[in-house]
Amino acid sequence: MKHGPDKRKSVSHRLAIVEGHLRKVQSMVKQGAYCIDIIHQSRAIQQALKHFDQQVLAQH
């Protein structure tokens, strides 16, 4: 990305959110969590990625 540090920081933060959600899902699967709860986290990941894509595209 050829944008300033503030925009890169914002995009990086968005990826950190996705990473946190992924780690949570991995933990939930290992612990045998309720499927619906896992799906809720999966949806959160999808939304975070959607926002990431929008943010990157807006800065293009």
Where are these regions (language model features)?
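Solvent-exposed interaction patches of small proteins and small membrane subunits
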Residues: 1-60
